[in-house]
Structure formats: C-alpha cells, structure tokens
C-alpha cells in the first residue's frame, strides 16, 4: 500500500476513514473521494461558488474533495460537503439557506452516499 504524505495531518486520517467507510457500507463513492484527496496539492480540487450555482439544482447534496472558494454568487439552496471552505464561500452558501458540512459530517449523515454528487 502506498504511503500517503501530506503536510496537513488531517488528510491521511480522512483518507483512511473514507476507505474504511467504503468497505463497511459497500459505498464506492467514498473510495473515489479518497483517491481524489490522495492527489498531490497541485492537483487538488478547488471549486468556486459560481460553479456550484451553475451546475447544482435546488436541494442537491454536493461533495467537493478539496476547497470551496468564494468567487461568484449562489442562487440555489444546496448542502455542500468539502475538505475545507473559505470564509466568503461559507457565508455565501449559508446566506441562501444552504448548509456547509465537513466530509466526516456527510459520512455520518449519509453512510451509503446515496444522492450525493461529486463536483470536481
């Protein structure tokens, strides 16, 4: 097994938890997210609020295996789970009635990962 190197000590722990949950709940979505989080920092996902607004519908549950940035505006009420959020992104999502979750909170809420869309 490949050793995961990261300057953020939270990353390898989260990747391990995602793999365990994928196996335990027969949910391949968590394994896919773990692979995306294991990428080098220069290839990590960064999604702006404007992209969420462009592609999401009202009430969607989105999973971003990276960081959510605050550029743009949001017009739909969505639940967004991500590795991290910028302060402006968090306030923009919550301003329209959406929820910001960590990936761990999403796993606790929805262990099977049903009706979750990965946005990368």
Swiss-Prot record:
One of its GO terms (cellular component) is cytosolic large ribosomal subunit. GO terms for molecular function: RNA binding; structural constituent of ribosome. GO terms for biological process: translation. Transmembrane segments: none annotated. InterPro entries: Ribosomal_eL18 (IPR000039), Ribosomal_eL18_arc (IPR022947), Ribosomal_uL15/eL18 (IPR021131), Ribosomal_uL15/eL18_sf (IPR036227), Ribosomal_uL15_CS (IPR001196). Keywords: Ribonucleoprotein, Ribosomal protein. It comes from the Archaea. It holds the Pfam family Ribosomal_L18. The keyword Zinc does not apply. The keyword Ribonucleoprotein applies. Belongs to the eukaryotic ribosomal protein eL18 family. NCBIfam families: PRK04005.1. This is Large ribosomal subunit protein eL18. The lineage of its organism: Archaea, Methanobacteriati, Methanobacteriota, Methanomada group, Methanococci.
């Amino acid at each position: 097994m490949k050793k995961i190197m990261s300057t953020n000590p939270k990353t390898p722990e989260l990747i391990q938890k995602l793999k365990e949950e994928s196996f335990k709940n027969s949910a391949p979505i968590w394994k896919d997210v773990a692979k995306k989080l294991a990428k080098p920092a220069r290839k990590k996902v960064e999604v702006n609020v404007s992209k969420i607004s462009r592609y999401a519908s009202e009430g969607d549950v989105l999973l971003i295996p990276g960081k959510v940035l605050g550029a743009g505006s949001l017009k739909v009420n969505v639940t967004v789970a991500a590795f991290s959020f910028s302060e402006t992104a968090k306030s923009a999502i919550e301003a329209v009635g959406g929820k910001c979750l960590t990936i761990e909170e999403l796993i606790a809420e929805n262990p099977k990962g049903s009706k979750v869309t990965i946005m990368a």
